[in-house]
Amino acid sequence: MSLSPKHTTPFSVSDILSPIEETYKKFGGVMDGAPPGLGAPLGAAAYRAPPSGPSSQAAAVAAGMQPPHAMAGHNAAAAAAAAAAAAAAAATYHMPPGVSQFPHSAMGSYCNGGLGNMGELPAYTDGMRGGAAAAATGWYGANTDPRYSSISRFMGPSAGVNVAGMGSLTGIADAAKSLAPLHAAAPRRKRRVLFSQAQVYELERRFKQQKYLSAPEREHLASMIHLTPTQVKIWFQNHRYKMKRQAKDKAAQQLQQEGGLGPPPPPPPPSPRRVAVPVLVKDGKPCQNGAGTPTPGQGGQQPQAPTPAPELEELSPSPPALHGPGGGLAALDAATGDYGGGVLGANLLYGRTW
């Protein structure tokens, strides 16, 4: 009975290793274009697969390895190789030249299945800091100024960030320094001095006696109540103004109170003037003085009988036929003349003619 199967299945060792070899060859070109310090060691350490060939197959069959176990082991190796290739590609496109993200020994141990050296992996920031320094050195060249070397001794790992932050703080400090003279130039308001009750009492007592003090009197009063002459002078000025304002407010209040009792009564209207209207005819008879109301001088006298005016008698003479030898006719003529004269005189006065 032969140990090798008659018909090969797709799960044989050669079928599994052939795509891995193609993948390795494909990424081999990328590794050849990688930096010198990264390509060869990483490529050698990343791929640790057993050699493929008839001898390896025979050894596997002789050892009694079943196809599923072999497939699982080689799948792990393939996954490790793919991860290493992806890391190499990422390092090629994202990392500066000459910088390796992981040590080759640690990567080799990981690909071989050992996890004991994972603690030896350096921090990511250390690699980035070293890469940035290497890139800066390659781009700008080494700086020989001794001042920069002395400064670099005092700068910590996060020097770039701190310098940026200190730049903003420096700007704020400069602005504060520029504003400082403005605040110093502004005049400061003096603190208000509070007098004691004894001092106020003495000042008020002296103010009642004398509202204006001379310089010697002011100095003497200030020495008595333990104040400065300037304070006494200012207090007297303020108190004089206060008294004047209080007097003015009091006078205005009194006027308001007096006006609140009631408005003053309006002056009585002037009495209508009595104008004497002359009455020419009263009870059908003309008046003598032409006034209907007696004058003050005539108040106690009896009104006299009206007599016909001579001019009216001349205007209305009695007819000649009536003047005869008979006395009765003469009396009648006289009476008729009197009555007719009175009526005629009234008609003439009112502008009517009969």
From Swiss-Prot:
Residues 290-304 have a biased composition (Low complexity). The keyword Ribonucleoprotein does not apply. Its main location: nucleus. GO terms for molecular function: DNA binding; DNA-binding transcription factor activity, RNA polymerase II-specific. GO terms for cellular component: nucleus. Residues 188-247 bind DNA. It is found in: Nucleus. In the embryo it is detected in the posterior hypothalamus and later in the head. In the adult it is detected only in testis. Residues 262-272 have a biased composition (Pro residues). The keyword DNA-binding applies. Probable transcription factor. This is Homeobox protein Nkx-2.4.
